[in-house]
Amino acid sequence: MRLGRIQNNYTNEGFDLVKNQGLSFIEICCNNDIEALKLIEARESVRAEILRTGIDVSSVGRWNHNIQSEGKINEENMKIYLDLLDTAIYLGAKSFVSGINYDESISLYKNYSNAIIFFKTLIDRADGRIKIAVQNCHWNNFVLSPREWEVILPELPKLCIKYDPSHAYNRNADYLQEMSDWGERIAHLHVKGTVHAGKRKVDDPPAGMDDINWGSVFAILYSRGYTGDLSIEPHSSAWQGDLGAAGIQFTKSFIEKYML
């Protein structure tokens, strides 16, 4: 296992920051088509930073999906997803993370059918050069839990999962059971803390000062033979600036205890 972080500043300053933090890689997350096109256009400069710093791009992802509407996969949007996937391959990433939005105009069956077509298109384009992983984040993505995985993943044996325990915890699901049952399909893991008080979520502090049972998380990862990367996700409005930088170092020290 290696430890890195999400870093959407992929200029020389962003790469230098990650290197100075003592981390091994960056993950780039694109939250819309504009951000995806920006990365596609910057692929040569990003590759130059990889060579300069020795910090690689472990994963590229697309969040907040708009890939289907009116019962069909949008071909123009699909091209951007495929170009982003090609960029991830060009940069040497290990995984490409995506999801698919739910189309309210069609049936659940048709949504599942379109999801299978969509992920199969990505898998075919990858052609074994990179792992395709579905995110368990709910942000304009409906393929996020065992209910959907049980339908889609058996149809696509090469489709993996990008797992974040905090997402399951925040929807009151059993993240340890999900990891135990589906651990062999996990290709990439987000390290993000989350804290609840009573029935309300409070914040997403650094992992290690949160509610997630990270010891059990790692016990399950080891039991399922996980050898993928661990990506710190800063995700708190409170932990910003100097406090945010200190939080990254806190998480790094905490998580490294489990990396045997």
Predicted segments with their positions:
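Histidine-acidic metal/acid-base catalytic patches
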Residues: 1-4, 9-22, 77, 92, ...
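N-terminal small/glycine-rich loop or linker at the start of catalytic domains
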Residues: 1-2, 58-68
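Active-site-proximal loop/turn and secondary-structure-junction residues that shape catalytic pockets
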Residues: 9-11, 30-32, 63-66, 100-104, ...
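Glycine-rich, proline-tolerant flexible connector loops at the mouths of alpha/beta enzymes
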Residues: 27-50, 100-107
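The substrate-binding groove and active-site-proximal loops of carbohydrate-active enzymes
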Residues: 32, 65-74, 208
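Catalytic-core regions built around general acid/base machinery
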Residues: 42-53, 118-125, 178, 216-220
